[in-house]
Amino acid sequence: MIMLKTQRRIAAELLKCGENRIWIDPERIEDVAAAITREDIKRLIHDGVIKKKPIKGQSRARARAFQEARKKGRHRGPGSKKGKKTARMGKKEVWMMTIRALRKELRKLKAEGKLDAHTYRRLYIRAKGGQFKNKRQLYMFMQEHGILKE
């Protein structure tokens, strides 16, 4: 086997890539071995005897397959979850969703005339204080205290 270490190094410098990315035509190895100057190497590059191999990318095929499976609901069980409960949806976002739902419900009841302004305000403040986890609890509180006008 002919040693082409120097030629490979010079070609790598000229083609601005690593030595491992240099391709040398196996049928013209003698010509490459005879090339000892940079000009000789440049001529061989021009003739297509020495080429730069393309960069090997990172295949996304497995990642795409994984994403497709996740769309179908696979890999989403409790064993696949990493981090806290709040890592997926923050405490503030959960609170915002809850309070918006409660306030919307209170507005609706007030618009329908089932709550007067004073009671609406009292319930609004209780909701703000975190007394109701959800609409169900709000309605249960209103029923227990006979607030809801039918």
UniProtKB/Swiss-Prot annotation:
Extent of Basic residues compositional bias: 71-89
Domain of life, per lineage: Archaea
The keyword Methyltransferase is assigned to this record: no
GO molecular function: large ribosomal subunit rRNA binding; RNA binding; structural constituent of ribosome
Keywords: Ribonucleoprotein, Ribosomal protein, RNA-binding, rRNA-binding
InterPro entries found in the cross-reference section: 60S_ribosomal_eL19_sf, Ribosomal_eL19, Ribosomal_eL19_CS, Ribosomal_eL19_dom, Ribosomal_eL19_dom1
GO CC aspect terms: cytosolic large ribosomal subunit
Keyword Cell inner membrane: no
GO biological process, one term: translation
Residue segments, region Disordered: 56-89
NCBIfam families tied to this protein: PRK08570.1
Oligomeric form and interacting partners: Part of the 50S ribosomal subunit.
PANTHER family in the cross-refs: 60S RIBOSOMAL PROTEIN L19
Family statement: Belongs to the eukaryotic ribosomal protein eL19 family.
HAMAP family tied to this protein: Ribosomal_eL19
Protein name listed in UniProt: Large ribosomal subunit protein eL19
GN (gene name): rpl19e
